[in-house]
Amino acid sequence: NRGRRRTTGSTGGSTGPATSPTGGSTGGSSYGRTGRHDLILRLATVEDLSDLYMMLLVMHSGTVDGTSPVKSEKLTSVISDALHRGIVIVAEVDGKIVGSIGGMETSDWWSDKLYLADLWFFVYKEHRKSRAALTLVKSFLEIGRDANIKVKLGHIYSGDIDRKDNFYERLGMSKVGSLYMES
């Protein structure tokens, strides 16, 4: 069953992960819930690697010009690392992944204080009007709170920056900087 567990009710309450980000691997843990349209959130497993890989290629194809090309081995390694040492949550509808957020604990270069940072956050275009994006981010934030560490989320290399900023701000997050690159 790939770590799925259905519960009834809204997507607001958490069944909680089996481990915190500091507790090691979360692959195979039970972390599911249902909401509207049979949306299921669950922790990803290694069985999801190829679906996540294909999803992230779609995400990359929608970025602005000037984005570095995908190196297959590196992308596979990063996904595998996140599956084994980080947090990867997938949203499913009818047994198919429609979105995901993945991240790792890290620290700023000047500090030992850990925070949970996203490596990716993506929902397929045809599911962006669903609650998938909202429930993925809320679950990621909840995992950080449960582990008593801050969460930092970002979005770069994509259009529609203002809409994405507003999305994060509606979740109580504050914008803390910008990223610039040569044209």
Residue ranges and their predicted role:
Residues V78-V90:
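A short helix-loop-beta-strand connector motif used in the catalytic cores of GNAT acetyltransferases and
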Residues L119-S130:
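A short, internal acetyl-CoA/4′-phosphopantetheine-binding micro-motif in the GNAT/acyltransferase core
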Residues V90, K96-E105:
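Conserved beta-strand in the GNAT
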Residues L39-M54:
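A short beta-loop-alpha structural element at the N-terminal edge
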Residues L57-V78:
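Conserved GNAT-fold acetyl-CoA-binding loop/helix
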Residues S107-D118, V176:
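A conserved beta-turn-beta hairpin within the catalytic core of GNAT-like acetyltransferases
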Residues K129-E142:
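Conserved acetyl-CoA-binding loop-helix of GNAT-fold acetyltransferases
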Residues K152-K164, M181-S183:
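Conserved beta-strand-loop-alpha-helix junction that forms the acyl-donor binding cleft
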